[in-house]
Amino acid sequence: MEWTLSPAGRFAATALLPPLLLLACGGAGQASRPAATPKPGQSEQAAMPLPPWASSMKVAIQSPADGAKITANQVPLQVSFSGFQPSCDLAGTANVQGTGHYHVEIDKSLVDMFCAPSATISMQNVKSGTHTLTVLPALNDHAEVEQNAKSVSIDYEPTQPLAEIAPASVGTPSIKIVSPKAGSTLNGAFDVWVQASNFNVTCDLEGKPDVAGYGHWHVNLDSTSGPMMGMMTMLRMSCGNVLHLSAKGMTPGRHTVIAFLADNQHAPLNPMIEDKVAVNVAR
C-alpha cells in the first residue's frame, strides 16, 4: 500500500500548519472521519510519500465515547497510541522511525499537537450541537498519517455556556524574542521567552473561527517557508509567554529560531509579525 503525505491540518496554514484529512480507519465505537476539504499546500504534498513505517503509527480515542453528551465547557480527551512513542522534543526536526506526536482537530480544524495520553479541548466560541473530534498520528515534521485517523462525535449541550469572545481593537501587534539571546549555544532543554504586544494570546480559541486581535504564536527552526508553508520546521506553538523546547533532534551548528504571531486557524498574521535570533546548537 502506498501512503501519501498531506499537509498537517491547518498547521499547514502557518508554519504549517497545521494547519489538517480524508479517511479514518474507524474502530469500535469510533465514527468514520467525514471528508475534508482541500488544504493549503495539499497539491505540493500529494506526491511526497510517507515512509513505509508510518503505517504502523496508530491512535485510538479512549474517551469521550462516540455520541457522548458534553455539558461542561471543556472536553477531556484520552488517547492511546501504538507503533510510535510520542515526543514533542522532536517536533519540527527530522523524522525518526518510532517517534512522532498526534494532532487533534475539532470539526476538521486543527487545535494543537500533543504528546501525552491526556488532552483538554476548550469549547470556547463553539456553538451547541454535534461536533467531531479527530485524532491523527503525526511524524516529527507534522506530516499526518491520515489513514490512521480516529474520530468521535460529541453532542455539546453546555449547562453554563461560555460568553463568546468578540473581536478586539488592540493596535499594531508585535512579538519579540526575549530569550535565547542572539549567539546563544543550545544544548538539551531550553526555553523560548517572548513578549507579545497588542495581541491577545489564548489556547481556548485554537482551531476555532478567527477573532480579530486574538491568536497565539509559533516557533519555527530556520524557516517559515517551503512545503506546507514551513510546517515541517515548526517546533511548537504557545499561548503564554514561554515555550519549553529541546535541541535534541536539531543538527549541530548555526540555526535561526523564529517566533511569529498566528491566528486561531494557525495562519501567520498578514503581514507576518515575527522575530528571529541566530543560535548555535552544541555538537
Please identify what each model-predicted range represents:
Residues 2-15:
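Bacterial N-terminal signal peptides that target proteins for export
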Residues 22-24:
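C-terminal motif of bacterial Sec signal peptides marking the signal peptidase cleavage site
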Residues 26-29:
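Bacterial signal peptide processing site
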Residues 32-36:
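C-terminal substrate-binding/catalytic lobe of Rossmann-fold NAD(P)-dependent oxidoreductases
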Residues 38-39, 134:
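N-terminal leader/capping segments at the start of a protein or of a new domain
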Residues 40-72, 157-187:
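Short, compositionally biased P/S/T/A/G/V-rich stretches that sit at domain boundaries
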Residues 52, 76, 82, 86-160, ...:
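Long, low-complexity serine/threonine/glycine- and acidic-rich segments characteristic of extracellular
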